Amino acid sequence: MKSTTTVEPFETVEPNTTNREDVSQLGDAPVAITRYGIPVRVSSATENGWEVFDPCGDLQTVSKIVPIENTQVVLDPGHGGKDSGAIGHAGLKESVVNLKVAIATSQLLQDKGFPTFLTRMSDYYISLDERIALADAANAKAFISIHHNAPASAASNTPGTEVFAQSKDSESARLSGLLHKEVFEALKGVKGVQWTSRWDAGALRVLNSQGSDAYRLVRKPETTNALIEVGYLSSPSEGAFMAKDEYVQIVAQALATA
């Protein structure tokens, strides 16, 4: 673990063979939650417990884990810890809003019978590569990275929701379209918010100069994925709305419905 990373501590372990299983018994998705509530990839069972990859992608040893199996949806709350993302109304951090939306969405999906897995469950930094590795290790059907945009764009009568898909993946395009439709329609019905939007907002595919997907979180995962910028946290009106529990529930319901 790099010293600059803010994260709940990994434990110092002593030899202990209780609560251990062979890593092969974790099934096709060797991911787990540590006793500190940190989602991790599992490398192997050892005499001292388990070797797992921490949020920086470094190997650490822990004495106890809770295996997570049969995941259908991985939710990735963007940013976290030293990487706060956009800063909005009254200092509201994007990383905090992303996490609230992800947790609420996870609960709704679980209630519908869809097992979920979050790449982070509190406010700490996790590398892009480890987010991607967690999503692929979970062997889920979908990976959704949740974000909020900045800087503010032009004033609009409708939300500026953007969802990015893998350029060569039809399932990613379908997922992005469904996410955009549900979130856009849910937010469009909210009264009293001055929206902002780019002219081309929607379900998008964005390429870099090499002709591949511009965003690493879209380009790299093998899991069907989409990255959503729900709205503009940097807009004073939208930012004030995003600070409310009402906003979190509206967006979570839309994401879970998609």
Language model feature labels by segment:
Residues M1-A258:
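Catalytic-site microenvironment of enzymes
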